[in-house]
Amino acid sequence: MLLALKITPQRSTQYAQLTASLAAPELLASPLHTMIHEVQPITLAGQSYLLATVDDTCLSDAMTVKILYRLGAISEVYEYFEQIGDVLGPLLRPVEPQFTSFVPLEMAEVRRYKGKTNEIFTRVLLNVALFAGNYANSSTQRIRILDPLAGGGTMLFAALASGYDAFGIELERQDVETTAVFVRQYLEGEHIHFREVDERARKAGRRYQFEVGSKGDTRHLVLVHGDCSAANLHMREVAGGPRVHAIVGDLPYGIQHFGEISDLLSRSLPIWEQMLLPGGTIALAWNATRIKRTEMMEVIQKGTQLQVRNDPPYTQFEHAVDRVIKKRDIIVAVKDI
């Protein structure tokens, strides 16, 4: 069977190239990789696609289709035919989505702020984190995601849209406060039911806890003002405590020298490792223009017992961002079960 997977369209050529470079490794990191025989980029009617040769049974499982529509770099899925009867192709038959976002995906898109990470890359990073661990197909657990470098909350909104509980820690108090304001305004504007809990912590400016969704089907969205290296302390009083399935973050791009990144990670990684559930993962993106992958691997291996995924496709996410960040990469490490 052939599938044509449309690469998520972008506003600019720069982001279109970024998304195209992420699409194949994201797909191959997914649980579907055992069904995939070949993947190649193609262009149909001026649009970029991946043409994937897959098992004939690929679409018979609703979970498989759900994963396809969870992919950040893929927006539409079609069966591909060279010919049907006497009609020459290529011909595409749409595959009905099996994934409905918990909140609109646009929640991660509409807010603009300085230093924001592209929302498509954010979704890819989140997916890759879960694909690498023991919870990629979990349908029995409420997945809990921590972004210890939350910034303006893009990762949190992507996680919430995927139906996960989302927890963010940010050192800049103003970022936490403005993000909390945005959350209230967006949810109210979209008529999405929510309530705030933990009023005392909110008034102190330390923590904002939102319970999003209708009764019986809610998710937690938590914003904490604090240092990422004390994540376990900040998470002690939130719903469910400090244990999480994945820790996903985008390291500060302004840091040009490895010493600063090394210091940040050396302080934080042992704490983050303790917070991970068995089979959980840490996935970090960083400016690889000056900091090598081997250096990132070394600091993770020195400070933790986590297993770095240094095999394809996890070594194939390097891509250009802009004129300043000529290389960005992803590193993923897994906690033993």
Per-region residue spans from a language model:
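Class I S-adenosyl-L-methionine-dependent methyltransferase catalytic core
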Residues: 2-26, 67-73, 84-146, 150-337
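N-terminal accessory interaction module
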Residues: 21-94
